[in-house]
């Protein structure tokens, strides 16, 4: 099933209003948000929330505790944003299984099997680019690997 996601970095209320008019299923939000703000955004704009937590060190993984009751999906991402920086994906094991986990941050085909066992969702956008442009060869290889893992 395909879901449409708007990726927003520290969006203003006006930006959220504009994006809420699009046929998006989720707002993927980067920034410092607490439960109160997430509840407000969900109620006002009728969107599910993927909240991104930037990972610089192992203790950053635990920041999910602040938003686990309101964010629909917790995304653990590198602190590099669009730079596709890796982090120790095993750190996510400290998060409970009852939350929907998403991982991003320099995920390439060689890491897919390991990551698929740690997270429910994998964000691979930067890993499938060459010079900041989607690379059809990388996408094809990635999809072949996904099919192999699912067979």
Locations of regions flagged by a protein language model:
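Glycine-rich phosphate-binding active-site loops on the catalytic face of alpha/beta enzymes
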Residues: 29-34, 78-85, 118-140
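C-terminal helical cap(s) of enzyme catalytic domains, especially alpha/beta-barrels
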Residues: 39-44, 125-151
């Amino acid at each position: 099933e395909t879901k449409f996601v708007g990726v927003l970095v520290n969006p203003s209320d006006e930006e959220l209003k504009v994006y809420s008019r699009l046929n998006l299923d989720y707002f993927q939000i980067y920034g410092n948000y607490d439960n109160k703000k997430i509840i407000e955004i969900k109620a006002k704009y009728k969107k599910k929330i993927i909240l991104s937590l930037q990972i610089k060190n192992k203790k950053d993984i635990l920041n999910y505790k602040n938003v686990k009751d309101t964010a629909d999906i917790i995304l653990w991402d590198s602190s590099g944003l669009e730079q596709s920086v890796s982090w120790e994906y095993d750190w996510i094991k400290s998060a409970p299984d009852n939350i929907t986990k998403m991982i991003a941050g320099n995920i390439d085909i060689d890491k897919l099997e390991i990551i698929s066992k740690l997270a429910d969702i994998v964000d691979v956008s930067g890993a499938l680019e060459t010079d900041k442009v989607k690379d059809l060869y990388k996408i094809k290889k990635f999809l072949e690997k996904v099919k192999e893992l699912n067979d």
